[in-house]
């Protein structure tokens, strides 16, 4: 049997995935990176985007937002503030949420409200880009 990478994907609500896979591609703050079995240890902040889990020739994509990735001798762990399977993204609801968030930026009464709304706009735009591909 070929080497496998142990991978854990954890959100605040629950563990979303735990198992052995061939490879995981992660949207790191400095760019996407791939993790294979026996990868050198490191940590990275993750940016909003899709992780791609590759196992036995099949790819599974999950949108993640916020958090970090840690590669150790034991494998890869991603602690994500939010995670949703790309196949489960409701693009119509997402378009409405994005429109509402953009309106909230315009209607914000102070800088804090504007920053919060702008952060939502950025998240929804990233989610929309992932869902489109």
UniProtKB/Swiss-Prot annotation:
A cellular-component GO term for this protein: proton-transporting ATP synthase complex
List UniProt keywords, sorted A-Z.
ATP synthesis, Cell inner membrane, Cell membrane, CF(1), Hydrogen ion transport, Ion transport, Membrane, Transport
Q: Does the keyword Transport apply?
A: yes
Gene3D superfamilies on file: F0F1 ATP synthase delta/epsilon subunit, N-terminal
Q: What is the protein's given name?
A: ATP synthase epsilon chain
Q: Which SUPFAM superfamilies match?
A: Epsilon subunit of F1F0-ATP synthase N-terminal domain
Q: Which family does it belong to?
A: Belongs to the ATPase epsilon chain family.
Topology relative to the membrane: Peripheral membrane protein
Q: Name one Pfam family in it.
A: ATP-synt_DE_N
Q: What is its main location?
A: membrane
Q: What is a single molecular function from GO for this protein?
A: ATP binding
Q: Which InterPro entries match?
A: ATP_synth_F1_dsu/esu, ATP_synth_F1_dsu/esu_N, ATPsynth_dsu/esu_N
Can you say where in the cell this protein is located? Cell inner membrane
Q: How does it assemble?
A: F-type ATPases have 2 components, CF(1) - the catalytic core - and CF(0) - the membrane proton channel. CF(1) has five subunits: alpha(3), beta(3), gamma(1), delta(1), epsilon(1). CF(0) has three main subunits: a, b and c.
Q: What does this protein do?
A: Produces ATP from ADP in the presence of a proton gradient across the membrane.
């Amino acid at each position: 049997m070929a080497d496998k990478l142990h991978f854990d994907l954890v959100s605040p609500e629950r563990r979303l995935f735990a198992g052995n896979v061939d490879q995981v591609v992660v949207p790191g703050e400095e760019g996407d990176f791939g993790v294979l079995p026996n990868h050198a240890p490191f940590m990275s902040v993750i940016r909003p985007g899709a992780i791609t889990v590759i196992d036995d020739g099949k790819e599974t994509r999950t949108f993640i937002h916020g958090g970090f990735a840690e590669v150790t001798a034991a494998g890869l762990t991603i602690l994500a503030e939010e995670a949703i399977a790309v196949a489960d993204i409701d693009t119509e609801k997402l378009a409405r949420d994005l429109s509402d968030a953009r309106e909230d930026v315009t209607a914000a009464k102070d800088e804090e409200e504007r920053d919060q709304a702008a952060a939502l706009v950025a998240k929804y735009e990233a989610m929309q880009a992932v869902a489109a591909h």
